[in-house]
Structure formats: structure tokens, C-alpha cells
Regions:
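Acidic, proline/glycine-enriched N-terminal capping motif
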Residues: 2-116, 121
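Internal alpha/beta scaffold segment
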Residues: 136, 141-162, 187
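Glycine-centered loop/turn motifs
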Residues: 106-110, 145-146, 189-199
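Helix N-cap motif at beta-to-alpha junctions
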Residues: 88, 141-146, 173-175
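Short, conserved secondary-structure transition motifs
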Residues: 161-178, 182
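Single conserved hydrophobic/aromatic residue that forms the stacking wall/gate
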Residues: 205-214
């Protein structure tokens, strides 16, 4: 790396638009709909799946955030990208895409999956959710899987699209305690490792100020 560049770090910052219309980059680097929660804490962002994902906040050091997720709980809005794959041949397509057997994943369950090139090189990984017998979401890490789905879907009865879903993660040993407090009904029981469930959450908008929203 150039010695001059090695003295700098590069980041993306949120700046007021001062009444000007958004620039083109505002549409190619969309922010999480709940990013307003982070704005009071001078966030720094990176580009992840062409989405903005927070890397740093002024209220916590890297070490403090690490120990929070190890010993307590954090709430984080990510750039992970869910893609929906549905239709009679959805399972067939996904078994062509991923190295682990999708047939074993039952509705209401998730599975860690990763996609590889034909020579074995890894494209990306993520969590596959089986929402129904013929409907899946793949919440992927950074990488281009959409084109790979399309390339392998020829001749199959399957639909591949972006459901316009954003991922927020509740992480840490106290994550289930927090979830029990925010969902409207009782936490699904049993709620096992890699289970998925559809629950409703009440959000209360109490103030026009981003600092005071709850």
C-alpha cells in the first residue's frame, strides 16, 4: 500500500443535505430505515452489499462493543441482504447453489449456508430461512449472489427477487431477554438454535427529534 494512504482510514459519514436534493450516491448507498437511531452518535459507515452498515459510534470503543456483545446485548442495523427465492423449484435451485443440503432444512428453521464457484472458491455465506415449503430467504453477507441465482435458475420454475427487507441483529447472551420485552406476544416456545418465527413488535414514535425517538 502507498505509504501516504497507509496513514489514513476511509469511512462514510452522514452529513446534512442543507435543503439540496440527494445526489446519485444517495440512491446507490441506501441507509437502513432505522439508521436515524445511530445519527446522534456520530456513526461511521462502510459499504456492504451496496448498503450502509455502521462500523463505529462515538459512544463506544471497539473493545467496549466487543465486550458488550460477549457479556450483555447489542442492537445493530446491518447491511446484510435478504433475497427471496420461491416457487416449486426453489429447493432444487438452492441445492445447486449451496454446499449444504437444503432439503434437510424444514419450514420454520434456518441453516448456515455458503455458495462456491465451480472451482471451490467461496462466493459468500449467510443464513438461509425456510419460511414455507417453497419459499426461502437467504440473508447473505457481502457479495454478488443475485447474478449467481439467475445464472443457475434457467429452466426452473422459481422466482428470485429482493423483498425489500432490512436486517437488524440482537446479539449477546441477554438477547432473548430483550426480545421477550419487545415482542407483543410471548416468545415462541420452544425457540431453538436456528429456529425462525414471525412475531409482531410495537414501535412507538414519541418525538420528531431523532435524539428522542423511542
Amino acid at each position: 500500500m502507498d505509504t501516504i494512504l497507509s496513514k489514513f482510514r476511509f469511512t462514510i459519514k452522514a452529513l446534512p443535505n442543507n435543503g439540496h436534493r440527494p445526489r446519485e450516491l444517495a440512491r446507490t448507498m441506501p441507509a437502513h430505515p432505522l439508521s436515524y437511531m445511530e445519527l446522534p452518535y456520530d456513526p461511521e459507515y462502510a459499504l456492504y452489499n451496496s448498503r450502509l452498515t455502521p462500523e463505529a459510534l462515538s459512544t463506544a470503543t471497539d473493545d467496549e462493543m466487543y465486550w458488550a456483545v460477549r457479556t450483555n446485548v447489542i442492537f445493530r442495523h446491518t447491511g446484510e441482504l435478504p433475497i427471496e427465492i420461491c416457487g416449486p423449484d426453489a429447493e432444487t435451485l438452492l441445492n445447486k447453489m449451496f454446499t449444504r443440503n437444503v432439503t434437510k432444512v424444514k419450514p420454520g428453521r434456518c441453516s448456515y449456508q455458503f455458495a462456491c464457484y465451480h472451482d471451490g472458491g467461496m462466493i459468500t455465506d449467510g443464513v438461509l430461512l425456510r419460511l414455507a415449503e417453497d419459499r426461502f430467504w437467504m440473508a447473505q453477507a457481502d457479495g454478488d449472489l443475485f447474478s449467481w441465482y439467475k445464472a443457475h435458475a434457467e429452466g426452473l420454475d422459481v422466482t428470485i427477487h429482493d423483498p425489500n427487507v432490512w436486517v437488524s441483529q440482537v446479539q449477546g447472551p441477554k438477547s432473548l431477554e430483550l426480545l421477550s420485552e419487545v415482542i407483543d406476544d410471548a416468545k415462541p416456545e420452544p425457540f431453538r438454535y436456528f429456529d425462525c418465527a414471525d412475531v409482531s413488535i410495537c414501535l412507538l414514535y414519541t418525538s420528531p427529534s431523532p435524539r428522542d425517538r423511542g
